[in-house]
Swiss-Prot record:
Residues the record lists as binding S-adenosyl-L-methionine: G38, G39, Y40, D56, F83, D100, Q107
Spans annotated as Disordered: 287-331
Identification of the protein by name: Ribosomal RNA small subunit methyltransferase H
One GO cellular component term: cytoplasm
Enzyme Commission number(s): 2.1.1.199
Signal peptide annotation: none
Localization per record: Cytoplasm
An individual GO BP term: rRNA base methylation
Function: Specifically methylates the N4 position of cytidine in position 1402 (C1402) of 16S rRNA.
Reactions performed catalytically: cytidine(1402) in 16S rRNA + S-adenosyl-L-methionine = N(4)-methylcytidine(1402) in 16S rRNA + S-adenosyl-L-homocysteine + H(+)
Amino acid sequence: MAEADTERRPHIPVLLRPLLAAVAPVEGTWLDGTFGAGGYARGLLEAGADRVIGVDRDPLALEMASGWAGDYGDRLRLVAGTFSQLDSHAGAPLDGVVLDLGVSSMQLDLAERGFSFQKDGPLDMRMSQEGESAADLVNTASEETLADILYHYGEERASRRIARAIVEARAAAPITRTLALAEIVARCLPRPKPGQMHPATRSFQAIRIAVNAEFSELVEGLEAAERALRPGGRLAVVTFHSLEDRIVKRFLQLRSGGEGQGNRYAPETRADAPRFTLPLRRAISPDEAELAENPRARSARLRVGVRTDAPAGKVDPQALGTPLIPKKGRR
């Protein structure tokens, strides 16, 4: 039933219109590194792209696209993989790259994927359906590691209290369901007032980021885009929370020749020859009309860079303010 519900509910790509305006003219070959339900890929094709390569590590996303992808013939090619390797998926210099970060509405709406703290399902959260699940992490990580994950990846101030509660709960029985974990977290925090976010929001974000190695994937993906784009090619990134937006902002700032101001994770840094120019003075946020249509877009930010002809290079993740959590083992 969940799958049918998702098929009836149209996916709304966030900030699509301002993204297409910011990267215009849309032409040549583009790569959508987070294909999902295909909203950005279709938007790019309809805006004038000759060809789009859609990449996703979620096999369900590619399976669900099989019903309509053929309508575009050889203009749309789907690839199972991660955007951290997007340059290897491209095969030739690209005219543009689009990344829509974080968990998709499609994944949130399917309870069996285990991303939602509002729907009961197995505690999974894996985008690729491979490797360690959220249940594996929650039931085996040490209390100190859990606290670090919650604090650094979720900016959760009550991280130690929540980590302690998780360890105490799993001692009685393994934590295997999303609502069970959400209840454990909620008991550690004040009851939210009307309009405030669910108390488990930050904790679920943090665990999801850890399970999917989202920050290392993002840094490697930005580097891969730098390698793959031709001079004049566009990089457009849509973020949904402050941590990933900070990484993208700092990457574009440093790669455009600016100086990083530093933060609690990174020192001040001076960049080499500019690899990007910045056509937007600041990030673009959804307007009121888009928020009325899609409330989930509220935290979205769009940033755009235009590739120069300077050689691509490696970037120090710490220079981007990427939170690094030491491996402290299991319980």
